[in-house]
Curated annotation (Swiss-Prot):
It comes from Litoria peronii (Emerald spotted tree frog). This is Peroniin-1.2a. Transmembrane segments: none annotated. Its main location: secreted. It comes from the Eukaryota. Keywords: Amidation, Amphibian defense peptide, Secreted. GO terms for biological process: defense response. The keyword Zinc does not apply.
Length: 13
């Protein structure tokens, strides 16, 4: 959850 926000990578849209 917060991990995705921490990583400045492109999320799976």
């Amino acid at each position: 959850d917060a991990q995705e926000k921490r990583q400045p990578w492109i999320p799976f849209v």
